[in-house]
Amino acid sequence: MRRIKVGVKLFETNTPGHYLLGTPKYFIRISTLAEKALALEIAKGRSDSEIFQEPGVDHEALEKIFSELEALQLIDSRESSLKVSQRFISKVEERVEKSKKGFVDAALLQLQSRALPELNQSRWISGVQDGGINSLTSRQNHLIEISGQNRVATILYSLLLLSGFSQVRFAPESRNRKPQIGDGDIGVIGIGPSEIGKSFRNHCESLRKEFSLFPLDRDHNYLDELSTPELRVHCGDSDPEKLSHWMSTSQNFLLIPNPQGDIAEIGPLVIPGKSPCMRCLLLVARDQNRAQQHLDLGASREVEYPHIAAHFIAAMAASFIANFFDSHIQDNQSQELVGTVVTVDYQSLSRPRSIVIPRHPLCGCAFQQLTEK
């Protein structure tokens, strides 16, 4: 069964009788009346087998169109359905059976409704042929730990929950200096003045059930400190000892350092032994005579992101994290932030800049993978 992906459309061109079938990114040309008739049926969402059964259909022309669309990854060729993590399988199967008998399960309908916008992203991942369902479903199995005390960390937490990463959590040491909700938290993930003074950690956990795309297990401890995250995300200035520990224990991590003036940064995403590390970044900056670490002049004012920039940075970071895990599911290595730092100017958010970091020959991380082999 082959069917076009949701979002593929038939476009007119300036040349009479000529059309484009696809998206603004990828498309095929339709230049005859016979092809147009077939393209209209395909654009309606009908499968190849359904159209083949129509009398008088040119099978060769139809196969040609589907083959061209498939080559551009504009076709879904596998049927799939949303699944929740293994601990819920029996519950969901029971709900599905009830729905077949005419019962309406509000929770299942809500999951399907909330998942549709997320599928508008995951179905277009390179190599996906099932409408993006497998990639979206797999997100709930990944453990992500966020550390940091700024707005970006808080917004990122909510975005990941809403995008299917049910197991995202804050590190135990997060908000140690600011355990209560304060004035700076107002407006972030629905926090209002009435929440000031409440426990930030407890508030975020109370939102987990409300924000999580997938259902949660009441018996599961999502704050289990003994479980090792698949990705650590640190927002703010980093501790060299902690980075060294993550490197030596082969823990993947993403850094979102504090902004410098009106310039924010995201990255790099470090895969120990397989990608450039933080020392590579410092050595490359030194070789290029760029500014490196700022001087420690004692007590300094804590710099918080403005709201607009905080949401922008958090959204970009969430996109990079989703790409990191979705790429693993599809066995491609297109992780965007590996070996890259993205800088964002508050005055021109629409023009972020990517800085590629190569592995530096003087950094020992290049030899870690060799020693592991």
Labelled PLM ranges:
Residues 1-373:
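Adenine nucleotide-associated cytosolic modules
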